[in-house]
């Protein structure tokens, strides 16, 4: 470009005197002009947009629409689009991090978005607010919540904004991003509307799949996502290329989803994998030869079915990873979590030093080395470390409060992942066995739940049409209602010596450790649950600790330790007289 001395002088003079756009047009070719306009290096630009589809790029390039609503089909890259849109807002549109807010419905989703954004834009991601509706609402209300308060905190936050009771700087936003928009309920949408009224120029980007709205039982309704589409200045995008599932699986899901009424999407999902795949029907799981080739999942409707399947797999010599129910307790009540917090000490300290953190982590891993919950603790601590530059106690408390055990249970190719359909939402597997009869159409929630199950599969889908086949053995998980809680008041030390996965013995309604000391007793509910099986000819053949927990009675300030367990039962053969 600069071939001689005079040209160099002219270039410098024009740089300082000429209109910037005219200067760029005169001295740079079209491709280079586009790169200069990007305000980032070509390598960074390629990382952001190089592997995105045309539709995904179209959504990210949309800088004009005040309301962007994306109806994203399964496997269409919803998470990728949202993360790259966040990166684009920060790097290409110069949206300041304090002006950007992303709301999700789970701590696991918030963590995943934060991790991916860190990978894309580096440390700048730490300053972006990616929060659940509940945690953001607690921030506005001005206190950390309890379980009871969490039920109404979103409504309360919306009311406070409407009444002008929230400091303006806390709610001054130029962009609001909503994940899983189909899951919004009345209070959630009221909060969104309050923010929209407070920030008249605020852009809203909402992504979701109305076909996967499976939380109607708690008030979610995709009509609120539809309401955003009807706003002036709204643009609806459909993402219908499925990069997850093979053609046979997508075709099967498409035929089924047509039965669901009131759908937002008008375009059928298309497989973009280039693979045929396979869909097969099985009468019973007992008929299946389950091979762990790639990631494999067995999805059920209930937690009880999950435990029965897991035990059946163990009897076949297959390892099962179970997304088990929390059984009526909070993640923060786990003995492993309580031990870690105790090792951190200094409850009044605002921050936790890295040295203290690492010491507490090491002691916890050593003390609970034999616990089957060790992997859960490792994932929990690792995720917090990745998403937090500094360790603030308030952040840790919030993180624990919003977390669930299943958030930290990872599927791998060495075991079969066993879960309810609800807990498998957002996951994907090479092979899926769907343990559910096809819904009869009377419940739209059931129909959508079945659709979620269908669309978890990547290569092979097995539809088990008669999942209620009687098994020779079953697993009976005990929850907080199934154990006699007052029994634990005098045996705290014995319970704290237990580890998840330890073997126990069952005798006359009591669970005993290796020293024949009673460490748990069944409640009336637990005895009734067990009797329902023993009346069918089943007997308890083994017992394994599932969790040890902290429990505080309503009439006491003292915490006690509770043991929950899985009872394994086998059908006894009738002897001929």
Give the ranges of each region predicted by the language model.
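P-loop NTPase Walker
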Residues: 1-145
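Conserved helicase/translocase P-loop NTPase motor core
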Residues: 51-67, 84, 129-174, 184-195, ...
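Conserved helicase motor core of SF1/SF2 NTP-dependent helicases
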Residues: 74-79, 84, 107, 175, ...
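Structural recognition of the conserved hydrophobic beta-strand(s) that form the central parallel beta-sheet
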Residues: 102, 130, 203-209, 462-463
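Core RecA-like ATPase module of SF1/SF2 helicases and allied nucleic-acid translocases
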Residues: 107, 247-250, 299-449, 454-462, ...
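Charge-dense polyanion-binding interfaces
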Residues: 155-163, 320-356, 536-574
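Conserved interdomain hinge at the start of the Helicase C-terminal
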Residues: 281-294
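Conserved active-site motif detector
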Residues: 468-577
């Amino acid at each position: 470009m600069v071939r001689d001395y005079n040209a160099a002088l002219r270039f410098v003079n024009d740089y300082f005197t000429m209109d910037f756009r005219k200067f760029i047009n005169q001295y740079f070719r079209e491709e280079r002009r586009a790169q200069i306009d990007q305000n980032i290096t070509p390598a960074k630009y390629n990382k952001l947009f190089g592997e995105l589809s045309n539709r995904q790029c179209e959504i990210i390039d949309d800088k004009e629409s005040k309301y962007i609503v994306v109806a994203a089909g399964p496997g269409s890259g919803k998470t990728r689009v949202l993360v790259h849109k966040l990166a684009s807002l920060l790097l290409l549109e110069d949206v300041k991090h304090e002006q950007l807010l992303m709301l999700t419905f789970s701590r696991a989703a918030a963590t995943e978005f934060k991790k991916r954004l860190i990978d894309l834009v580096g440390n700048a991601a730490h300053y972006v607010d990616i929060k659940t509706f509940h945690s953001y609402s607690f921030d506005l209300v001005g206190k950390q919540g309890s379980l009871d308060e969490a039920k109404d905190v979103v409504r309360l936050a919306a009311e406070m904004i409407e009444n002008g009771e929230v400091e303006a700087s806390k709610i001054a936003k130029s962009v609001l991003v909503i994940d899983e928009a189909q899951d919004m309920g009345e209070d959630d949408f009221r909060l969104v509307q309050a923010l929209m009224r407070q920030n008249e120029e605020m852009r809203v980007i909402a992504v979701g799949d109305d076909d996967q709205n499976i939380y109607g039982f708690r008030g979610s309704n995709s009509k609120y996502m539809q309401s955003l589409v009807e706003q002036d200045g709204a643009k609806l995008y459909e993402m219908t290329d499925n990069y997850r599932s093979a053609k046979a699986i997508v075709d099967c899901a498409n035929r089924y989803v047509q039965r669901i009424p009131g759908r937002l999407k008008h375009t059928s999902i298309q497989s973009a994998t280039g693979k045929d795949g396979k869909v097969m029907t099985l009468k019973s799981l007992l008929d299946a030869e389950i091979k762990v080739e790639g990631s494999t999942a067995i999805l059920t409707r209930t937690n009880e079915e999950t435990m029965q399947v897991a035990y059946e797999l163990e009897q076949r010599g297959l390892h099962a990873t179970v997304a088990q129910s929390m059984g009526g307790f909070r993640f923060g009540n786990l003995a492993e979590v309580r031990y870690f917090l105790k090792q951190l000490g200094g409850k009044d300290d605002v921050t936790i030093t890295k040295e203290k953190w690492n010491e507490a982590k090491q002691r916890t891993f050593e003390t609970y080395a034999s616990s089957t919950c060790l992997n859960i603790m490792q994932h929990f601590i690792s995720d917090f470390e990745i998403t937090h530059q500094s360790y603030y106690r308030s952040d840790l408390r919030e993180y624990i409060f919003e977390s669930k055990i299943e958030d930290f249970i990872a599927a791998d190719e060495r075991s079969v992942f066993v879960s309810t359909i609800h807990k498998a939402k957002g996951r994907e597997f090479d092979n899926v066995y769907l343990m559910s009869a096809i819904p009869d159409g009377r419940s739209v929630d059931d129909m959508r739940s079945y659709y979620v199950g269908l669309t978890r599969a990547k290569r092979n889908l097995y539809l088990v049409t008669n999942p209620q086949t009687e098994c020779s053995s079953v697993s009976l998980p005990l929850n907080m209602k199934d154990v006699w809680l007052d029994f634990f008041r005098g045996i705290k030390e014995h319970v704290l010596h237990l580890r998840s996965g330890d073997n126990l013995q069952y005798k006359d309604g009591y669970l005993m450790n290796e020293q024949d000391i009673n460490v748990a007793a069944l409640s009336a509910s637990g005895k009734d649950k067990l009797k329902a099986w023993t009346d069918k000819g089943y007997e308890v053949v083994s017992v394994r600790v599932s969790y040890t927990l902290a429990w505080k009675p309503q009439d006491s300030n003292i915490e006690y330790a509770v043991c929950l367990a899985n009872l394994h039962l086998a059908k006894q053969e009738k002897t001929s007289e």
